[in-house]
Amino acid sequence: MQHTGNCETLIVNSCFGSTCARSIPVFIDSCDLTAEVSRDEETRLARSMPVVLEKIESIIEKIFQTSGPNIVHDKDRAKIALCRLLLGPVAVPCFCEEWDTNDYLSKSGCKCIGPILYIHTSRCRCSDIPVFKFSIMKDYYASHVFRGLLSLKEWNTHLPNVLCTCELSMSDRYVATVYPKQNSIYLEYYPYFLCYLCRHLTVIEIEQCTNDLISLLGPKVAQRVIIHFKLLFGFRHKPHIGTVDSWFWENFFMLELHKLWLTVVKHNRVTTDFFNVVYEKIQNYKQYAIKTLRMSSKAVPAIQRLCLAKFKQQLLYLNIKVTVKKNKREMCLNGFVYGKTLYVVESSQLIFRNLLLLYYDYSLPDECKTNEENVLTAHYIRVISRLSFKRSRSALPPGVRPDFIFVAQQPKRKELPNVPGGIDFAEITSVRHGAVTLNAFNTNKVMNLKATISKRANFVYHRIPKTMTHSFVMYKHTFKEPAFTVSTFVSNDDLDMSSLNINIRGPYCDFLYALGVYKMHVSIRDLFLPAFVCNSNNSVDLQGLENQDVVRNRKKKVYWITNFPCMISNANKVNVGWFKAGTGIIPRVSGEDLQNVLLQELNNVREIPGLVFDMDLHQLLVLLEQRNLHQIPFLVKQFLIFLRLGLLMGYGHSRRNKVHDIMLHLISNGLFDFNKNSVANTKIKHGCALVGTRLANNVPKIIARQKKMKLDHMGRNANSLAVLRFIVKSGEQKNKTVFIKLLEYLAETSTAINTRNEVARLLQTLTAKVKT
């Protein structure tokens, strides 16, 4: 005790820091002290012990504290504690005089044939705490043992050693982590250790950690690890209630079902009736209900009563995913049978399968019992007694690091927020291959979802053809704001529900808004999300491509669509259509499938010989696309291209970086931003309905040779060469000198042979016209 001024401060000097554990070698390479654990010691481990939850929690907390000061995250500490428990308890026999004993030595009188430690206390300079000098003897009486958990040497580098380190050459891989004798570990404690570990780790993470440990230590040690893994999950009886009120255990299932009730998105007469019936049966037929709720996924029960109309509504409102199959009496998980039909639910919704059985009065046979594996401690004794680490050692597999240290989690880089509704609803999908970026924009998507009808009186049976047994389109609505089309499918075998087919363009928020608008106009009670995207059309532009014609000339076969050619390529079994000016369309796919198609197609495009990109222009146009989340209209793109071309001619090609910075500044400040609601290039019915037919057909036109011509007839993505070619060939240019300067600059700066040849022909044509 130290005195500080007028107050007394009690300072307790602990040589162990925040943990009371210590490390001791087991000498596996030389004499293997672990092989000398007597059968009496194994019997002690496996004997039945009274479970005191406070003591067990104190032990596992001490195992957690052994992880070391560098491990700051609870999940990493839990993994190291799990690995120690998987390697299992170990005892190191020794002989010492009574006056040399401490809190780590437990009495254990037995005759040892193999080597044991002879230890005596020493004040050696190699340590600031009392340590033991030691020697190894054979065929000697063991008076005490050190008890703890087997560990790897790298896990215990921060722990003080029991033995004197100046005489210790630590070349062995295994050590023992020993604890005070009042913290003895028994096999009975293992399932309770699992309860503590599950506060920080999921079962999947526990299994993954076990597999990593087995792959690190080799197959010969796998048996020992697997035995202790099974012991963790070895509850053979109901845990003691202890201080918990018995009322809680009697109402445990009711509380769990109440949690399911709270997870239901919408409560109505369907969900209320379902849970009320289940609650009533649990209260009135407790044993029957518990057996039904505990039914294994491997069992395929058959029910005798099922109301299909009510069953379909229950699936919708409870969000239960069910697959309907023919009952072929095959092995099936998570299913039940009604008549000749097999209904299979998802593995994560097995509890709902059992609740449905309870609701529809499934009679549980008495002989139907779950055969759960029971871990016997006798099996543990037989295996561990034969298991010597000297025989079990195995070399590391090739490529496996010798370390097994859990590193503290690194702070993750802040990522962009997720797309609302998922990547299937993304307005833009970007991929990158090298320095080239490809942006795909969704033109429209078709989605299916379920809905329930609110007014059955509107449907008259005789209006529906009796021969029509499948769904057909009952209604079709087209809306202007937001612009979308809805087809309503109604089947004559179910007048309470309908399927909706929605054709829309835009983000997920627009889709939700469209559903609200649709619900105001029709007799729909509830809409069930998430919607399934069954079709999605996308459009892409190859920005900054100098020789755009080579994209469609890479294959011989060209399909003719309407009045212009379209080259069809195939990527991941999806046909990609390439039009003039490097514009493509990708049908059917969205989300990750669309990304894979884009990467494959971009890789194919990059392999085209002679392909040349103006990377500065490519970067500017891609930035403008990503800024506006829309494809760039023709006039905006030409304004940007020729403004940049004029600046390059004014500043000179040597100062192109200055021009690039100017253009980046203009784009970042919104000079080239445009209205996304332009319908000049669309042919979608509901897109045109937004502004009306007359305005939708009002595509910008120019007069060339006393004839009106659509401004984008050469392609929305036309580059400067395509526009100059059109102007020169039309012969309507007034100041030919300006066009000659533009073409000469393109000839000087372009690296594409096709571009230079085309520019030379255009210059020859213009020069001839100037002379004449």
Swiss-Prot record:
S-S pairs: none
Domain of life from the UniProt record: Viruses
InterPro entries reported in the protein's UniProt record: Herpes_UL87_C, Herpes_UL87_N
Similarity remark: Belongs to the herpesviridae UL87 family.
Protein name: Protein U58
Organism: Human herpesvirus 6A (strain Uganda-1102) (HHV-6 variant A)
